[in-house]
Regions:
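NTP-dependent small-molecule kinase module
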Residues: 9, 33-38, 58, 62, ...
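Short, positively charged and aromatic/hydrophobic N-terminal segments
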Residues: 9-11, 15-24
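Hydrophobic anchor at the beta1->P-loop junction of P-loop NTPases
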Residues: 44
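P-loop (Walker A) phosphate-binding loop of NTP-binding proteins
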Residues: 47
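Conserved lysine of the Walker
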Residues: 52
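Hydrophobic positions on the alpha1 helix immediately C-terminal to the Walker A/P-loop
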Residues: 55
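ATP-dependent small-molecule kinase phosphotransfer cores
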Residues: 70-118, 122-127
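A glycine- and Lys/Arg-enriched "phosphate-lid" helix/loop adjacent to the NTP-binding pocket
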Residues: 130-173
């Protein structure tokens, strides 16, 4: 039996299914990527600090899409902040909650900014790839390091003893694995990134 939880987010009706609380481009490696055309949504993935929410808001406005921040959806559904969920449930417990909610997202014509740890949920990523074009906002480690402040306050899912560098090295291959498009973002302004992505969407 499918369970649907409906609520309004940012004036948009979002449906969460089965959630219970408890034009082609290539990367530098030559990997073929799918076009944004024909996709219902655009899904942004990447490290914390990569600019997913910032780029997402501007890109949504440019395309006439709605904007959805999956971290805020998680907080809306659980009534708790991300760092509170990590403290209460541990990293693994938080990742399970995140995966369940992201795997049930159901919306159209939206730019979805995801949490940096979304790629640990295989079920969620398969679903997001089905409902949208997944775009990896790729930044070098130095750029990420310069941008980030207190990781704990940001609700970053760090395991005991894990450093930001460890996290970066662990996650980057997963971002590459799930992305339809890899968008290089080093030394680029938000408007430049948005222009490049919008050009792909309208190609």
């Amino acid at each position: 039996m499918e369970v649907y939880v409906c609520f309004c987010y940012n004036k948009m009706r979002v449906t969460i299914k089965n959630y219970e609380k408890s034009n082609t481009i290539k990367t530098r490696e030559g990997k073929n990527m799918e076009t944004m055309q024909g996709k219902k949504n655009i899904v942004l993935i990447g490290m914390p600090g990569a600019g997913k929410s910032t780029v997402g808001v501007v890109l949504a406005k440019r395309l006439g899409y709605r904007f959805l921040d999956s971290d805020l959806v998680i907080q809306e559904q659980t009534k708790k902040l991300l760092h509170e969920l990590i403290t209460e449930h541990g990293v693994d417990g938080f990742l399970k909650i995140e995966e369940d909610i992201n795997a049930g997202l159901d919306c159209e014509q939206a730019v979805i900014a995801t949490g940096g740890s979304v790629i640990y949920g295989e079920k969620a990523m398969e679903h997001l790839r089905e409902i949208g074009c997944v775009v990896y906002l790729k930044l070098s480690y130095k750029e990420i390091e310069d941008r980030l402040g207190d990781l704990t306050a940001r609700g970053v899912a760090l395991k005991n003893g894990q450093t930001l560098k460890d996290l970066y090295n662990e996650r980057c291959p997963l971002y590459e694995k799930y992305a339809h498009i890899v968008q290089e973002c080093d030394h680029k302004r938000v408007r430049e990134i948005v222009h490049e992505l919008a050009s792909q969407a309208n190609a």
